[in-house]
Amino acid sequence: MEDFKYRNYYVLRVTGGQEINVALILEERIKTNNINEIFSVVVPPNIKGYVILEATGPHVVKLISSGIRHVKGVAHGLIQKEDVTKFVSKSVALPAVKEGDLVEVISGPFRGMQAQVVRVESTKNEVVLNILESSYPVQVTVPLEQVKPVKR
């Protein structure tokens, strides 16, 4: 297998909602035609109507995508690798809580209840809470994204 120096990211415009179907067809064409100039096919999860191909040149992208029903064409220009990683990486802003903080549970079976943070397990993204609205002390472990800070 040849080692290609230049890997560029090209954007295919496709019919909205057909991104996964187009990606599967592209994958099948790449395998059956033994094309080694395309390195990856990316379907950005939050962007409708686009499929990103990592390839050596635009001629390869046009060759492999020609004749596919839902492909509208190749977008002009290239896209940077940093932009592609931004599209596909999962970045969730977790609330900053520490022991002793008052929080409100925003989802799950304890939704709407006030609680006090007993312990934060940052490796698991979980928090141990003491529910304040119960008649006896109840400690529960919930995911960190299910709480919202109220007071410190």
Swiss-Prot record:
Q: Does the keyword Glycoprotein apply?
A: no
- Supply the SUPFAM superfamilies for this chain: Translation proteins SH3-like domain (SSF50104)
Read off the InterPro entries from this record.
Answer: KOW, NGN-domain, NGN-like_dom, NGN_dom_sf, Rib_uL2_dom2, Ribosomal_uL24_CS, Spt5_arc, Translation_prot_SH3-like_sf
| Keywords in alphabetical order | Transcription, Transcription regulation
Per the record, the GO terms for biological process are:
regulation of DNA-templated transcription; transcription elongation-coupled chromatin remodeling
Organism superkingdom: Archaea
Domain KOW intervals? 99-129
The molecular function terms in GO held by this entry are: structural constituent of ribosome; translation elongation factor activity
Q: What family classification does the UniProt entry report for this protein?
A: Belongs to the archaeal Spt5 family.
NCBIfam families in UniProt: KOW_elon_Spt5 (TIGR00405)
Primary role: Stimulates transcription elongation.
Q: Subunit arrangement?
A: Heterodimer composed of Spt4 and Spt5. Interacts with RNA polymerase (RNAP).
Q: What is this protein called?
A: Transcription elongation factor Spt5
Q: Gene of origin? A: spt5
